Amino acid sequence: EYITARDLVTVPDLAREVWRTQMMSPERQRVSPFFLGGDTIIISYPTDTMTHEEKLMSLRGNNPHFSRAVVHHELIPGHHLQQFMLKRYRPYRSEFATPFWMEGWALYWEMLLWDLGFAETPEDKIGMLFWRKHRCARIIFSLNYHLKRMTPDECIEYLVDRVGHERNNATAEVRRSFAGSYGPLYQAAYMLGGLQIRQLHEELVQKGSWSNRQFHDAILQEHSMPIEMLRAKLLQLPLEADWQPTW
């Protein structure tokens, strides 16, 4: 309702209805300590296989203020609305999917909602700022790991000491970054893509004549592509046949 009341983006009625929730397995929580989104909100929370201390770390890491801060990243207008629209607009462009667009869009909304005053209480503001710090820390530890400047244990300590993560959650976060199929730039793509979309918003909406809704609808309907190419498409800039984006 916060999104639609401000006419920020079109949310089809069906998109509101078709998402669901399920509990994340204890095994998966070892690499995904926080809830995930898409057409299903997968809840990371204490299970009966955890020790008491592990349950407390899970509760603290998924407290209501931290979770409220990223619900729009995972659900609407984030990954759930993304996936809903991608199935309906230009699905052939899925071959050109990039995390700079996919994750950048979700993080862009975290920044925009902060600007719009979505965080109403000091606790909610801390929740949003915690995740902002987390996104930045991901860039630092993941790139340093791939450059062989940090070990996994050093990455865990970095998240505990510099971000304030619970140790179990920091360990799972590091596993997620390195044990899966993520490329070396995946974690950087959140922030870089988000900042690129933010800059495009400034150009077309804040300094241009586009409305928020027009801008956000256009991005979703163009499907996934490098943000520089998206800008060229939205501005109808001429492109040569061999043109390549710098990002």
Where are these regions (language model features)?
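Long, His/Glu/Asp-enriched segments that create or flank divalent metal/ion-associated functional microenvironments
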Residues: 1-247
